[in-house]
Regions:
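Bacterial signal peptide processing site
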Residues: 23-27
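Compact, glycine-rich, soluble single-domain proteins
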Residues: 32-136, 142-169
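Sec-dependent bacterial lipoprotein signal peptides
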Residues: 1-21
């Protein structure tokens, strides 16, 4: 192999390598962005209200240790046929109503979002099994960037706030 040919071959290989690295950097940056929301958030003091059937609420505190705000857009759990993010809002004539929360649960940078009875919470609907006190429930949060955060929540007996979860209507 002549020196001229080897130099040209080396130059072509270097150019191909740069193009490949450039393409993979974009993919890596996208993957890092997708991992960002879930990796910045922790769930604390999480629990689920015990229920024999139907539906129930999940509560706790979502903490964002990141430098950017994130938004939880959905949740899932193998114990429920359907899971929704809910809010409780006051009505003009008094009382309050529970409804799906448009836009999800925003968590500011360095802040928290509390899920509590009578306020924002996660609804586990169409329960597939009784949720008994002391058991754990698997839940996965999904964020607007596509990342996910799995966690478990303990089932507890709770009669405070006198909440009764029933379908509307």
């Amino acid at each position: 192999m002549s020196n001229g040919f080897a130099i040209r071959l080396g130059a072509v290989m270097a150019a191909v390598s740069l193009v490949a690295v450039g393409c993979s950097t974009t993919d890596t940056a996208t993957e890092n962005k997708h991992a960002l929301a879930a990796s910045a958030v922790t769930v604390a003091d999480q629990w689920v209200k015990a229920a024999p059937s139907g539906m129930t609420g999940l509560f706790g505190t979502l903490k964002n240790a990141g430098e950017h705000g994130v938004t939880v857009v959905s949740a899932s759990s193998p114990v429920a046929g359907k899971v929704e993010l809910h809010e409780v809002v006051g009505q003009a004539g008094g009382g309050s109503v529970m409804r799906p929360k448009d836009g999800g649960f925003p968590i500011p940078a360095g802040g928290t979002h509390v899920l509590a009875p009578g306020a924002d919470h996660i609804m586990l609907m169409d329960l597939k099994q009784p949720l008994q006190v002391g058991k754990d429930v698997e839940v996965t949060l999904s964020f607007e960037d596509g990342s996910t955060l799995p966690f478990t929540a303990q089932v507890r007996d709770f009669s405070g706030a006198d909440e009764s979860y029933k379908p509307a209507g």
